[in-house]
């Protein structure tokens, strides 16, 4: 999982990427290709 300060560019890397808020943190998740996972902060 990558840790980035900005997730906007990571969201556009794959068409199945979704932005999710969990416990005040922002994550990018991808069910079909898990190597695109990322976390902000």
UniProtKB/Swiss-Prot annotation:
Pfam (any one): Ribosomal_L36
Signal peptide stretch: none
Keywords: Ribonucleoprotein, Ribosomal protein
InterPro entries given in the database record: Ribosomal_bL36 (IPR000473), Ribosomal_bL36_sp (IPR035977), Ribosomal_L36_bact (IPR047621)
Record bears the keyword Ribonucleoprotein: yes
Molecular function (Gene Ontology), one example: structural constituent of ribosome
Gene Ontology, cellular component aspect: ribonucleoprotein complex; ribosome
GO annotation (BP), single: translation
Source organism, top-level taxon: Bacteria
PANTHER family cross-referenced by the UniProt entry: 50S RIBOSOMAL PROTEIN L36 2, LARGE RIBOSOMAL SUBUNIT PROTEIN BL36B
Family as reported in the entry's similarity comment: Belongs to the bacterial ribosomal protein bL36 family.
Record's protein name: Large ribosomal subunit protein bL36
Provenance organism: Phenylobacterium zucineum (strain HLK1)
Lineage: Bacteria, Pseudomonadati, Pseudomonadota, Alphaproteobacteria, Caulobacterales
The gene coding this protein: rpmJ
């Amino acid at each position: 999982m990558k840790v980035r300060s900005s997730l906007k560019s990571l969201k556009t890397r794959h068409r199945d990427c979704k932005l999710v808020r969990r416990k005040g943190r922002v994550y990018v998740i991808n069910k079909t290709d898990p190597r695109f996972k990322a976390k902000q902060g």
